[in-house]
Amino acid sequence: MKIIHSADIHLGSKIEAKLPKDKADIRKSEVRQAFNKMVSYAALHEIKIIMISGDLFDSGVPLKKDKDYFYSVVRNNPDIDFIYLRGNHDIKEICLENIPGNLKTFSEEWTTYIYGNVSISGIELTENNYKNAGLRLDLPADTTNIVMLHGQHDKLPINNLKNADYVALGHLHTFAEIESNIRGKCVYSGCLEGRGFDEAGTKGFVVVDTDKIS
């Protein structure tokens, strides 16, 4: 099975601080276009899961038009599960009555979604739960285990996740593979679209092949 790992999309980012309004509006549309292209890639290649490891939105109180845009993309792709872990910039509350059925979310306790022999677990870390979070997740040795986390890697409970085959990280805006003592890989996908000169270079997402990581 193939899964997309993405993060740090920052829908609704206020790019006006660095650009005139007309050019900022163009850049905002390009952020959406990058997200659309990723979803189209998934549909074209029959990838059924898109992981978003935090900072889908740029604000904890995103504009209605940005939420509506995201929900419309999810609803228009019912064959794809969007697994969304909120990050430090993200929307604080999700109205569970309105979210599409194929949008999967997390909380401040570990949540696991099962797809055959593949488990995808995640937790939204806070000051109250991050110190012992890794000790509360039991990853079986005989399954392919993916873990989603958002934050600076040296402050995350990665080394407690011994049986993790792939840790899908968000927070850094460039691709990076982090050293750890888990049995698999620990990866920042980077952002989909750079929003300024400080985010130059190749951007995009990671395609995870579960047959090759376990």
PLM regions and their residue ranges:
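A short C-terminal boundary segment appended to hydrolase-like catalytic domains
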Residues: 210-214
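His/Asp/Glu-rich metal-coordinating catalytic cores
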Residues: 49, 58-187, 191-203, 209
